[in-house]
């Protein structure tokens, strides 16, 4: 459900890909219920993709969420990203590689608005980086396809899989012609969006709307106590 507008600004100096062999491919900073780690926990995660035809061992490489601390977490042992394949690092704070599953020594909080994933090789040279832009519950952000150049939004995250189902961004939040409150008589409610191409769906019973809810086609009458919720798709 796309209910609010997120301002997404990717600064050029925070999104670099100097060598192109290993890239940050996808991440979720809101993994509440979509992907479990090897301990059965829903930890946030970052996915790397090896664009080359050879396996790459990240032993001694660095990953951080703070650009001013690029060596915050060093891969403590061998961690292979196979040729043309993806690998997940869980941002759990556990600081381990156990059975080929990697856990960084830090957690991420997307509401801080100042976190940036930075991947560096063993010499400390930055290989890739990307700002942690907020997303809704269990959504992710990633390249439109594995290793692609365009960053997109995924309402169904694709950890350890091909990036598919990319969306450009959330649609703007719908507007209501009336505010919440008590009214002495019936009235017509108008829903609108700043996006002329948006389709608005709504419910009148307080349930969470999606694109199977009522499609808004024009003002509708409210004559009894109702809880109206709306979502825009574009």
Task: List each model region and its residues.
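Bacterial Sec-dependent N-terminal signal peptides
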Residues: 1-22
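Composition- and surface-driven signal marking solvent-exposed, interaction-prone regions
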Residues: 3, 61, 214-217
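Short linear sequence motifs
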Residues: 3-8, 99, 134, 176, ...
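Residue-level detector of functional hotspots within protein domains
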Residues: 8, 31-34, 47-49, 127, ...
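Sterically constrained small-residue positions within well-ordered secondary structures
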Residues: 11, 37-39, 54, 108-110, ...
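Activation on beta-sandwich/Ig-like modules and their edge loops
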Residues: 19-153, 212
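Short, compositionally stereotyped local motifs that mark structural "simplifiers"
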Residues: 139-234
């Amino acid at each position: 459900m796309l209910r609010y507008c997120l301002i997404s600004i990717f600064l050029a100096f925070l999104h670099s890909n100097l060598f192109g062999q290993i890239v940050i491919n996808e991440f979720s900073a809101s993994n509440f219920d979509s992907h479990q780690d090897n301990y059965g926990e829903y930890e946030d995660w970052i996915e790397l993709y090896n664009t080359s035809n050879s396996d790459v061992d990240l032993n001694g490489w660095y990953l951080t969420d703070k650009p001013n601390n690029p060596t915050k977490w060093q891969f403590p042992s061998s961690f292979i990203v196979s040729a043309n394949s993806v690998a997940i690092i869980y941002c759990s704070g556990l600081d381990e590689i156990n059975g080929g599953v990697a856990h960084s020594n830090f957690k991420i909080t997307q509401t801080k608005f100042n976190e940036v994933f930075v991947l560096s090789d063993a010499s400390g040279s930055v290989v890739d980086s990307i700002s942690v832009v907020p997303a809704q519950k269990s959504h992710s952000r990633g390249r439109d396809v594995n290793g692609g150049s365009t960053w997109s939004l995924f309402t169904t995250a694709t950890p350890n899989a091909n990036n598919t189902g990319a969306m450009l961004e959330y649609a703007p939040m719908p507007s209501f012609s009336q505010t919440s409150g008590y009214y002495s008589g019936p009235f017509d409610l108008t829903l609108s969006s700043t996006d002329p191409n948006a389709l608005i769906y709504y419910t009148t019973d307080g349930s969470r709307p999606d694109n199977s809810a009522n499609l808004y086609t024009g003002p509708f009458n409210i004559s009894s106590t109702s809880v109206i919720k709306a979502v825009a798709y574009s």
